């Protein structure tokens, strides 16, 4: 064998190896599915509760200044609903077999974490894929209701309380706000709008009780387990107003007024009868008996309304019938969540879900006091207001006008203007 012939054979062998290698590489590439190169997402709705400050906080951000309420997009900064991101197909994926893509998508979904799993309270986003599908629309509806309530409240404040944004928050403005630090919640107490049961819920959230049913009325109202916001120094107040979720629950004003009257004056009461009852009977009942003046018992609803509307009333106001706009200062404090007594169960449990409360905690439905007595309803409210003249009804409506306006309640009587 000559050296020239050996060299030619080696060259041919090397060329054959390169040719087979290139052919194998092309075959391998042609068998790959380009869809594997593009990320897949599980279909569903992504609900995002984003903090405003600090970034790692999982709660809704609140501003104490009305001037900072509106974001450029026009959506509230508290609850934020986002549509799901649509997966982007790879440019070469159009020709891939449909069956192969579906099979690989199913395999990918199986590897995803379970929907609705909370990956920790420090996460700034909560991904919820409610089941069944009807829960999706329910969640969206409750979210939209919150947006509308806050919009109405902002507009009323802008129209009638234009100077509020320039006022500083003082301890007096936050004296009715209760603090729950574990879940970073601030709750403004509105008496006769479910406040007793809300305090029970806060005590369970704080780890002070295992069940709302175990907490007695006196513990709720006369104990010191829950802190008020005005007990903190200024730095503590400002910090919590800026970073905690602030919420309040309201009630139809006439209905709330009647509920307060029934509770405080139609049942024995060692405080309201001697303090308010005696003063009301002495001023507004002609020829009141000695017994009535001694005990303060037996105040009638028209007499109570006379006291309420009197600018020179003989005894001051009380939180049970004071305006919500005075109790909670909603034009000065930017509340993230506005619930209503009339839709308490839905609103309360929606709120508990938003703050990642324990799954077994729901809002209690029992009546706190006088459980044998019917709740104050619209029908009962009309019966009490039927005892008043049309002028008294109008003046009472005027008295609560800001509450009707801010919380979008309809006029309770057709002859009101």
From Swiss-Prot:
The keyword Membrane applies. One of its GO terms (cellular component) is Golgi membrane. Residues 1-10 are cytoplasmic. Residues 32-417 are lumenal. It is an enzyme of class 2 (transferase). The keyword Hydrolase does not apply. One of its GO terms (biological process) is proteoglycan biosynthetic process. This is Carbohydrate sulfotransferase 8. The chain crosses the membrane at residues 11-31. 3'-phosphoadenylyl sulfate binds at residues 191-197, 251-259. Strongly expressed in brain. Weakly expressed in lung and kidney. Weakly expressed in pituitary. Pfam families: Sulfotransfer_2. Keywords: Carbohydrate metabolism, Glycoprotein, Golgi apparatus, Membrane, Signal-anchor, Transferase, Transmembrane, Transmembrane helix. It comes from Mus musculus (Mouse). Belongs to the sulfotransferase 2 family. Catalyzes the transfer of sulfate to position 4 of non-reducing N-acetylgalactosamine (GalNAc) residues in both N-glycans and O-glycans. Required for biosynthesis of glycoprotein hormones lutropin and thyrotropin, by mediating sulfation of their carbohydrate structures. Only active against terminal GalNAcbeta1,GalNAcbeta. Not active toward chondroitin.
């Amino acid at each position: 064998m000559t050296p020239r012939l050996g060299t030619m054979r080696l060259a041919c062998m090397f060329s054959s190896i390169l040719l087979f290698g290139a052919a194998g590489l092309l075959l391998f590439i042609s068998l790959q599915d380009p869809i594997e190169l593009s990320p897949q997402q599980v279909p569903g709705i992504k609900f995002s509760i984003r903090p405003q400050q600090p970034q790692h906080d999982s709660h809704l951000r609140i501003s104490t200044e009305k001037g900072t309420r509106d974001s450029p997009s026009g959506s509230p900064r508290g609850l934020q609903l986002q549509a799901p991101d649509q997966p982007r197909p790879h440019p070469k994926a159009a020709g891939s077999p449909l069956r192969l893509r579906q099979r690989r998508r199913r395999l990918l979904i199986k590897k995803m974490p379970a929907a609705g799993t909370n990956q920790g309270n420090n996460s700034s986003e909560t991904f919820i894929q409610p089941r069944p599908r009807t829960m999706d629309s329910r969640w969206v509806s409750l979210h939209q209701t919150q947006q509308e309530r806050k919009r109405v409240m902002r507009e009323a404040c802008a129209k009638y309380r234009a100077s509020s944004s320039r006022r500083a928050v003082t301890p007096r403005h936050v004296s009715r706000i209760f603090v729950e630090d574990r879940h970073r919640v601030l709750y403004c107490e509105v008496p006769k709008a479910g406040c007793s049961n809300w305090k029970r819920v806060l005590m369970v959230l704080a780890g002070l009780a295992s069940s709302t049913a175990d907490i007695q009325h006196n513990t709720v109202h006369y104990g010191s387990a829950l802190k008020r916001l005005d007990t903190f120094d200024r730095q503590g107040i400002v910090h919590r107003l800026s970073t905690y979720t602030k919420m309040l629950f309201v009630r139809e004003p006439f209905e709330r007024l009647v509920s307060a009257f029934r509770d405080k004056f139609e049942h024995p009461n060692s405080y309201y009868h001697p303090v308010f009852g005696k003063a009301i009977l002495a001023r507004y009942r002609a020829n009141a008996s000695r017994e009535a003046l001694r005990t303060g018992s037996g105040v009638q609803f028209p007499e109570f309304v006379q006291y309420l509307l009197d600018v020179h009333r003989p005894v001051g106001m009380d939180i049970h019938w004071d305006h919500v706009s005075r109790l909670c200062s909603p034009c000065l404090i930017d509340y993230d969540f506005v619930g209503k007594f009339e839709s308490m169960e839905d609103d309360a449990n929606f709120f508990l879900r938003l703050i990642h409360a324990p799954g077994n905690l729901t809002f209690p439905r029992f009546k706190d006091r006088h459980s044998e007595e019917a709740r104050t309803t619209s029908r009962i409210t009309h019966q009490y207001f039927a005892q008043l003249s049309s002028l008294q009804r109008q003046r009472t409506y005027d008295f609560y006008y800001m509450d009707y306006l801010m919380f979008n309640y309809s006029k309770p009587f057709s002859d009101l203007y």
